[in-house]
Amino acid sequence: MSLVDLGKKLLEAARAGQDDEVRILMANGAPFTTDWLGTSPLHLAAQYGHYSTTEVLLRAGVSRDARTKVDRTPLHMAASEGHASIVEVLLKHGADVNAKDMLKMTALHWATEHNHQEVVELLIKYGADVHTQSKFCKTAFDISIDNGNEDLAEILQIAMQNQINTNPESPDTVTIHAATPQFIIGPGGVVNLTDETGVSAVQFGNSSTSVLATLAALAEASAPLSNSSETPVVATEEVVTAESVDGAIQQVVSSGGQQVITIVTDGIQLGNLHSIPTSGIGQPIIVTMPDGQQVLTVPATDIAEETVISEEPPAKRQCIEIIENRVESAEIEEREALQKQLDEANREAQKYRQQLLKKEQEAEAYRQKLEAMTRLQTNKEAV
């Protein structure tokens, strides 16, 4: 039996989960070949849930991060199908948990897409980056929201809060964790941003932003300025942390009977803003987002539950526009290609018509010659 045949049989044995057959074929020198899609025996064993076959192939030295023609690894296959045990054995053998396929989707994206909660938890346990975005600017959390899977969304949201966003695609994203003390330094003294409920984490970027404690603390810190009978003075207060944070600067300006809080950073999303305690707030508060988003005004006498609906981040808008442009370009190219094929077909048809006309003319001439020869022969016989 040739090596090509041995390789084909190894693929079929891996697909069927025939461990003994896999061992025999490898002992006889079967190569670790792939099919026309680049699928290896390990891909097939992982896809079809054959745990023992997967272990046999891994011990034999099959590449744990082999790629198909669309850059999918065995881990992608197992995660997509929900085979948690195979996902774990691949990760224990050193498979790349953050490997991306042609769509820039990781195993976590695919497990979330198919609602495999056990696999999602396992991937997070082994260090999967929950901030990674696909080619369509979607994180695993975005996919869970799109699919309406609240349980997965909660798991992923907790993981995002516990992970520092080191995604190179979002360099402006800054995360300040609750463990990092935050203070405001200004004329009103040093104010700790942590409120009685312990809400002190402020996260800038694509995740939710908690600003309730910040608003209350800023208003309380600047209250002496607004109650003073002296000439209004513009006071600037800055947020400092125990660690250096360059991306988040908050300013409070008290002038003209209002308190204006400006959060200076890139790509801030302000989610649902619930009620703010009335204690310590004597004047309206205006929150201005720096990227052209809405302004929220909370009167001191009528503080109610407000919801600010912000536009999509510039990065996501740009990504969507790029995808739309690519789709339009692809449609234009497809129409042009079809038009070229149609023109070519018309030219071929015209050429065939001309050839047919020429053949008909030749046939007519030949028929006339035959008739002339027949008349001549008839005349000779009559003579």
UniProtKB/Swiss-Prot annotation:
One of its GO terms (molecular function) is transcription cis-regulatory region binding. Its main location: nucleus. InterPro entries: Ankyrin-SOCS_Box, Ankyrin_rpt, Ankyrin_rpt-contain_sf. The keyword Nucleus applies. Transmembrane segments: none annotated. Pfam families: Ank (PF00023), Ank_2 (PF12796). The modification N6-acetyllysine is found at K69, K340, K369. The keyword Transcription applies. It comes from the Eukaryota. It is found in: Nucleus. ANK repeats lie at residues 5-34, 37-66, 70-99, 103-132, 136-166. Transcription factor capable of interacting with purine rich repeats (GA repeats). Acts as a master regulator of nuclear-encoded mitochondrial genes. This is GA-binding protein subunit beta-1. The gene is GABPB1.
